[in-house]
Amino acid sequence: MLAPIQKFTLGLYSEHLTSIGFLLDLRQAYFGAGDVPWTKVAELDSRIEAHRDALELGGPDATHHAVQLLASDDTDALRGAVYHLAWIGPKAKGHKEMITAWMGVVEDRLTTYKQALRYAAQAHRQIDVGVVLKSVDPLLLEAALKVSRFCEDVKAEQVLPLCSHDAVTVRRAAVELIALKGARPLLPTLERAVLDEAKSVDERNSFWLLVLGSTRVLQAAREACRRGETIAPQWLMCLAYAGSAADLPLFTRAVGNPASRLAALQACGVFGHVELVPLLIAALAAADEFERVTAATALETITGAGLTEQAVMALTTEVESADVVGTTDGNTKVADDVVEFTRICTVQGEWAAWWSANLSRFGASPRWRRGKPATLGVFIEQLAEPSSSDQLRRMNQLELVVRSGMSIDCAWDGPVAEQLVAIGKWQQWWKKVQAEHANDYWLFAGRG
C-alpha cells in the first residue's frame, strides 16, 4: 500500500502529465481555429514547459509513472506521458518503453502518439524512431515518417526505399519527408520512382518533387492540364506554386471544365494572378454553396479585401430512439441549435463593386497575395504576422521553398519559439538577396 505522501506525489505527476496532454491538444485547436493570433500559442508552450520542468524534478519516479500511463484510457494522460518520455531522450529509462508501446498501439491511439511525438521532435529532441521505420505496419510507418520529418538524426537517404513501398500512404509520407528535408541530390532518383517506374503517376508525390525543384513535374502538370480531362488538384497546385505567367490560360481553361472546376478555383487563389479575379467573381453566381465559398476564398487570398458575411449552420445531434417521443427504433438526428458565424463574403454584387473601386491599385504586380505583390519578401512578412492564418502561413512557407530553392523548415504548428527562429532565418536570407529578386515574381527553385 502506498504511503499518503507517495499517493500525493503520484497524483501531482498525473496532474502534470494530463495537463501537458490537454495543452498539446488545445494548442493544435488554436492553430486550426484561425481566430487566435498564432504567436499567442507561445503562452501554451510556456505552460507545457513549466509542467515538464516539474516532472524533471520528479526524476525516475515521474518517468516510471509516465510509463505506467502508457496504458491509460485517458487520452490527455497518454498524450502527456508520450511527450514526456520522448522529451527525456533515447538514453533515459522510459524512452525505449514508450517506443515499444508505440509499435504495439492500436490504430485509434496512433494520432495521440503522433501529436505528442511531433511536438517533441519539432523542438529538436532526439527520438529513437529508427526501429519504428522498420515496421511492416503501413499505418505505423506513415506516423513514424510524419514524426521523422523533424528528427535531425533521420536522414533522407534512410527513408528513400520507402518511396517504393506497397502502401500509397507510406510512399507519399516518405516523398514528403525527403522534400521537406531539402534533399535535392535525391531528386533524380525520386523522379525515376514517381514519374517513370510507378504503375501510375501519383500527383501528390509529384507536388513534392516540385518542392525539390523538379522541372519535369511542371512539364507533366502542363501536359495533364492541356489534355482537358479531369485534372488532379495537385497538377494545378504545381503550376500555382511555380507561378509562371505563361500558365494563366491553363487556369482559365480548368475553371471552365466542370470536372476540375473546384480544384481550379482553389488553385487560382494560390496562383494569385490579377487577371483571374473577374473569373472568380463570375464563379460566385454558382448554385453550389461550396463552389461559391471556394471562389470567395480564392478572391480573399488574392486581394485581402476583408469582405465578410453572416452565415448560419444547423448543429445536429444523434440520440437513441428510446429518448425521442414517438419513435420506436433506430437513431434519430435532431437539430438542436442553429449557429450564426462570420465567413468570407460570397455575394457576387459586393465583390464586383469592391473590385471596380479597387482595380486601379492592382497594377504593380501580376501576382498578389492578400492584397500585396506576391514577392518572396511579402511571403516572409506574412509568415511573421501574428494575424496570418495557418492556411496562409503554410501556403507562403511552401512557395518560399519552391521559388527560392532554400530549405528552411517552419512548421506552422510547431513550438512558437522554433517558428520565430525559422522566420528569422528567412528574414536574414531575404535581406541578403532582395536586391537580386525584389522584382522577380516568377522565380522557380532559385533558377528563374
PLM ranges: what are they?
Residues 1-111, 115-126, 135-141, 145-155, ...:
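N-terminal alpha-helical scaffold/docking segments in eukaryotic complex subunits
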Residues 78, 110-113, 141, 171, ...:
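Residue-level detector of extended alpha-helical repeat arrays and alpha-solenoid scaffolds
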Residues 86, 118, 149, 179, ...:
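Structural signature of alpha-helical solenoid repeat scaffolds
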Residues 59-70, 90-103, 122-134, 152-164, ...:
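Amphipathic alpha-helical scaffolding segments comprising HEAT/armadillo-like alpha-solenoid repeats
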Residues 308-365:
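Amphipathic alpha-helical blocks and their helix-capping loop/short-beta junctions
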Residues 82, 113-114, 130, 142-145, ...:
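Hydrophobic core positions within HEAT/HEAT-like alpha-solenoid repeats
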Residues 258-320, 325:
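Repeat-solenoid scaffold signature
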Residues 2-19, 170-171, 176-187, 191-225, ...:
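Long, acidic/serine-threonine-rich intrinsically disordered regions with weak helical/coil propensity
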